[in-house]
């Protein structure tokens, strides 16, 4: 079933333009870019209707209920700290026929509240079956939704509420504090509270209602009841109508709202489906836990519903049993066949495996690495027997993720080739994807039927892609020698309509002819696959005039067992970069004992500890073939957790560079000065 080279073709009807490559597209789009997944599916709610008809008894969505919150107290660095553990029940499911009725009831309830297509509903909560059902309930009545990450500040929420004039907000109870501030001076009239959230404990809804008498405060269940007693048929919606205003999680300034029509979103799903439909079926079980306010997660979940698969809702805190009591983690309980994650998730799994392996005896280590070498060789040369060690040697690792995974998919940002190969061999084959909010998650996607190494994969059949030279950075599409490289520009039905109430930003985002400028640098390899080099904003010119790619270096240095998060920092005044890291405290403490460090040297702030981490990173640089100017010369070890709540990373775990530099300004300046 392997696909044939080239994996992308030149798009018909274009003339060669100096400084640009000819646009390329997926072979499936040879006679025209794809817009809709199938006949009759022209709006988002059509996905639900179709699956309810074709797969009425299939399990659509599954959720776990909170049984009990366990509170434990531990002494950490001479201070008592409270730890919260969750006890969850088994997954309970709704069939597709039940889910369709639920969405209609939600839409009917919103209509009874007086909403129509001229109003907007703001969704502000963690990923859950209730969140996605709210989006489909809105779609059934042509009501546009506005999405906001549950980690956004009150200022950001206030900005998007004010800009969109949303009159209804749906939120989780633990976000009432943030919402209370954000709702001031907004046009919100009704607050819908999702009491089904596992994080709902300890938040007084009645108190919120009493303190805010200006709002009509109801629960998610009460909205369903309202719709059940006032049923309305879904209304006709045009594919050109607005489906969603999705606010990006950018790390600079206030977030932009991307206007996405039903046609845009369906084209995005169609593009993704075109890359995977030959290896998925209605038997797929996909664990849903990434933010639904992110385009890739929202597109993925709707795609799973389109094919009749099952969504099992989880949370990053409950994926494993580390934060649970008396129950399994989501992965073991749900047993997914496909799982999507970001680099930090995959690096955490890899490091956990290596940590346990390092505690094993000589024989166990030898067996593991021998099996790894054999399977790697068999995969590289397509030899039989590559799965012979899967149960014997890698079985325990696979059981950590439920034991049924066929594919894992990395999104959000780049991942080191070594990590991709490691997890592909011991867990499940890793696929990689590239896309943006503005392109409805479309860009490029790898396939198990297309051999590739460092490239992402073939482009989506819903878009054309071209490269434009960036002479000032040394990237050219028509160089006499060397690859065709340049900024990635995208055009097609999956591309959004523009930024909400921001005509200047929209104009700046597009090149003539409707080509969206991604800000990413790419290359088409000789197989037709798209390779991502870096973001234009992540390229830094060094003192000697050469450029280094920060995100590329971070994906490599992130493989160190000594660190959990890393940001590479470079400056024109210096010849080489430094790193700012969130340390793997347990690993470093164990390593300091192993190396015989004194108590003073074992602290994270000691010079000896910094020297050990720096030596480790420089060794990784040598083994990865990095140049001298790409090799770090200093390290800043931080003492705060890098989470969206701390502001150091975005909700999709991308680095918030400006915030990090400002937060650790003194330490960074001291480190830079020390290296000269």
Swiss-Prot record:
It is an enzyme of class 6 (ligase). Disruption phenotype: Does not affect fumonisin production. Increases the production of ceramide intermediates including 3-ketosphinganine, sphinganine and phytosphingosine in comparison to the control. Causes growth inhibition in both solid and liquid media. InterPro entries: AMP-dep_synth/lig_dom, ANL_N_sf. Disulfide bonds: none annotated. AMP binds at residues 245-256. Pfam families: AMP-binding (PF00501). Residues 552-655 are annotated as: AMP-binding. GO terms for biological process: long-chain fatty-acyl-CoA metabolic process. It comes from Gibberella moniliformis (strain M3125 / FGSC 7600) (Maize ear and stalk rot fungus). One of its GO terms (molecular function) is ATP binding. The keyword ATP-binding applies. It is found in: Endoplasmic reticulum. Pathway: Mycotoxin biosynthesis. The lineage of its organism: Eukaryota, Fungi, Dikarya, Ascomycota, Pezizomycotina. Its EC number is 6.2.1.-. GO terms for cellular component: endoplasmic reticulum; lipid droplet; plasma membrane. Its main location: endoplasmic reticulum. This is Palmitoyl-CoA ligase FUM16. The keyword Endoplasmic reticulum applies. Belongs to the ATP-dependent AMP-binding enzyme family. Palmitoyl-CoA ligase; part of the gene cluster that mediates the biosynthesis of fumonisins B1 (FB1), B2 (FB2), B3 (FB3), and B4 (FB4), which are carcinogenic mycotoxins. Plays a role in the synthesis of ceramide and is involved in self-protection from fumonisin B1 toxicity. The biosynthesis starts with the FUM1-catalyzed carbon chain assembly from one molecule of acetyl-CoA, eight molecules of malonyl-CoA, and two molecules of methionine (in S-adenosyl form). Keywords: ATP-binding, Endoplasmic reticulum, Ligase, Nucleotide-binding. SUPFAM superfamilies: Acetyl-CoA synthetase-like (SSF56801).
């Amino acid at each position: 079933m392997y696909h044939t080279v080239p994996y992308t073709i030149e798009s018909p009807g274009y003339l060669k333009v100096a400084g640009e490559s000819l646009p390329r597209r997926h072979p499936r789009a040879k006679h025209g870019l794809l817009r809709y997944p199938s006949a009759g599916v022209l709006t988002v709610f059509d996905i639900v209707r179709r699956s309810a008809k074709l797969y009425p008894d299939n399990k659509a969505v599954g959720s776990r209920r909170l049984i009990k919150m366990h509170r434990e107290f531990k002494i950490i660095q001479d201070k008592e700290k409270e730890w919260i553990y969750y006890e969850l029940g088994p997954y309970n499911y709704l069939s597709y026929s039940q889910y369709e009725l639920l969405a209609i009831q939600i839409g009917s309830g919103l209509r009874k509240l007086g909403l129509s297509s001229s109003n907007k509903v703001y969704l502000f909560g963690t990923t859950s079956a209730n969140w996605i059902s709210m989006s489909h309930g809105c779609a059934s009545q042509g009501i546009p939704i506005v999405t906001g990450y549950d980690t956004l500040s009150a200022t950001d929420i206030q900005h998007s509420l004010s800009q969109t004039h949303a009159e209804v907000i749906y939120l989780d109870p633990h976000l009432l504090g943030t919402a209370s501030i954000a709702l001031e001076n907004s046009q919100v009239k009704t607050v819908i509270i999702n009491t089904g959230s596992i994080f709902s404990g300890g938040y007084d809804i009645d108190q919120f209602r009493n303190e805010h008498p200006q709002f009509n405060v109801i629960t998610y269940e009460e909205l369903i009841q309202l719709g059940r007693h006032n049923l309305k048929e879904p209304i006709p919606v045009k594919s050109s109508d607005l489906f969603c205003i999705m606010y990006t999680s950018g790390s600079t300034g206030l977030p932009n709202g991307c206007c996405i029509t039903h046609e845009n979103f369906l084209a995005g799903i169609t593009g993704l489906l075109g890359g995977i439909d030959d290896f998925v079926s209605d038997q797929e079980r996909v664990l849903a836990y990434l933010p639904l306010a992110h385009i890739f997660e929202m597109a993925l979940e709707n795609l799973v519903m389109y094919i009749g698969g099952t969504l099992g809702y989880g949370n990053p805190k409950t994926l494993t049993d580390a934060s649970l009591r008396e129950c399994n983690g989501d992965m073991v309980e749900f047993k997914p066949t496909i799982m999507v994650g970001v680099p930090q998730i995959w690096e955490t799994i890899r490091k956990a495996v290596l940590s346990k392996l390092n505690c094993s005896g000589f024989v166990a280590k030898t067996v593991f690495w021998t099996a790894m070498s054999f399977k790697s060789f068999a995969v590289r040369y397509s030899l039989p027997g590559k799965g012979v060690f899967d149960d014997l040697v890698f079985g325990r690792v696979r059981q950590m993720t439920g034991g049924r995974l066929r594919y894992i998919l990395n999104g959000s940002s780049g991942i080191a080739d070594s990590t991709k190969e490691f997890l592909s061999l011991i867990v499940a084959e890793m696929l990689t994807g590239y896309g943006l909010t503005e392109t409805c998650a479309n860009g490029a996607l790898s396939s198990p039927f297309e051999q590739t190494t460092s490239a992402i994969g073939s482009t989506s059949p819903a878009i054309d892609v071209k490269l434009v030279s960036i002479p000032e950075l040394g990237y050219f599409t028509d160089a006499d020698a060397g690859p065709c490289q340049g900024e990635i520009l995208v055009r097609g039905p999956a591309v959004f309509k523009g930024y909400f109430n921001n005509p200047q930003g929209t104009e700046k985002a597009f090149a003539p002819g409707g080509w969206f400028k991604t800000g990413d640098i790419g290359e088409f390899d000789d197989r037709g696959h798209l390779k991502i080099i870096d973001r234009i904003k992540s390229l830094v010119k060094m003192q000697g005039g050469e450029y280094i790619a920060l995100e590329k270096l971070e994906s490599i240095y992130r493989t160190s067992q000594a660190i959990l998060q890393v940001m590479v920092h470079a400056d024109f005044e210096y010849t080489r970069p430094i790193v700012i890291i969130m340390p793997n405290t347990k690993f470093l403490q164990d390593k300091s004992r192993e190396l015989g460090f004194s108590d003073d040297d074992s602290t994270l702030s000691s010079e000896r500890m910094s020297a050990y981490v720096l030596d480790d990173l420089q060794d990784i640089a040598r083994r990865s073939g990095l140049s001298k100017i790409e090799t770090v010369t200093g390290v800043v070890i931080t003492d705060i957790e890098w989470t969206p709540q701390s502001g150091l990373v975005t909700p999709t775990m991308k680095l918030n560079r400006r915030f990090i530099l400002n937060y650790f300004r003194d330490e960074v300046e001291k480190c830079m000065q020390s290296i000269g």
